[in-house]
């Protein structure tokens, strides 16, 4: 039996755990342990340029593909990165468990190569195929509501940053498309 987990939904779960700790509904060590398990899972999971699949078989740490295509989800990855970076800020106590969590979250974030998934005009691809021949008809990530956080993560990356103009280019691309339609 497979246990399918969603990358994007896991981001919401991480944030809920933090809110639960803050409001004293969830024990801090319980939340820390769960988020630690998630980061261990992500560090050993298959990815492409640091981008995760939308779904995984939790027992095997392998992607669960829809429509038999190996596709990795840029927005789902951005959502879980955001949640993990918030957790990294929240779990800031000076003890080994929290230091270890912060270090692993940094590892997950640092391995995302935003430059490798950007087009020549610095627009991020919304999906990323495992095999290049399956990476056809891939629309750029330019949705005004959902793209902003992804582009902010990409422009703030310590090693593989996109230029800060990339977000503005994505917005312009979206308006240009609307104007042409």
Question: PLM features: residue spans?
Answer:
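Short glycine/serine- and small hydrophobic-enriched flexible loop segments
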Residues: 14-22, 82-89, 151-154
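Membrane helical hairpin/interfacial module
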Residues: 2-11, 15-70
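Extended ligand-binding clefts on enzyme/binding-domain cores
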Residues: 50-77, 83-85, 93-181
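Short, compositionally biased low-complexity segments
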Residues: 8-10, 78-81
